[in-house]
Amino acid sequence: MENGKSNTNNLITNNKVITIDGPSGAGKGTLTKLVAEKLGWHILDSGALYRILGVAAERADIDLSIEPLSDKNKESITRIARNLNVEFKLNSDSGEVEPYLDDKNLGKQIRTDQAGQSASKVAAIPTVRDALLARQRDFEQAPGLVADGRDMGTIVFNDAPIKIFLTASAECRAKRRYEQLINKGVGVSIRALLESIKARDERDQNRPVAPLVPADGAFVVDSSELSISQVFDQVIDYIGKKRPELLQ
């Protein structure tokens, strides 16, 4: 992998890339892990980068709850993005990839609903997306990469041979999140979760830069009525028909 890759939308990749885009709660993370395990490829959780940036911005005393963000705050967040000291390390005990900011394990701190809302806000800043673009492309390494995000197939790896768009109804995603939190002993209102998901969808789909839309030629899967194993089977079947050599 060359470090000096072009940051244009006509990026020519040397290795194999599968992109999996879609809204929060559709099951992208689980699907990405399953596909990567099947192929023995690397994983990029691009959403984690934006969640980490949201945490870093709040640590720098930038109030992300005030909307719209001021130009000064946007500039400050962009500077943080350009100097973000992030690593992803494999936990040999759990098998999970854990995020580190400035050598400190963020653990589950970036997986809260608040972190997701913060990520959506910083991701709407065009200069932030530019700052993180090259960093995301640097994850592309042999033997291949499965990239999970919202603009992986439209912007970051727009020439990927396989593009997946995984979606589900807002109601279904709210129910899934509600059940996850209840199982963890966290009391929450499903109505509040649904409102939060709809607000994030609105922000992600209508931002001026890299809005959340299926990439041209993407294989669209609605997981609302499907189990994750059914989604996985559909995706592997699609890959096998379109690019069978990737499964060899």
Mark where each language-model region is.
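Extreme N-terminal, non-catalytic leader segments
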Residues: M1-V17
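The conserved Walker
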Residues: S24
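Conserved lysine of the Walker
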Residues: K28
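Hydrophobic positions on the alpha1 helix immediately C-terminal to the Walker A/P-loop
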Residues: L31
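N-terminal phosphate/diphosphate-binding loop that engages ATP/GTP or pyrophosphate donors
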Residues: K38-I110
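Small-molecule kinase domains that catalyze NTP-dependent phosphoryl transfer to phosphate-bearing small molecules
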Residues: L90-N91, Q136-A142, R150-D159, K184-Q234
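ATP-dependent NMP and nucleoside kinases share a basic, alpha-helical "lid"
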Residues: L106-K184
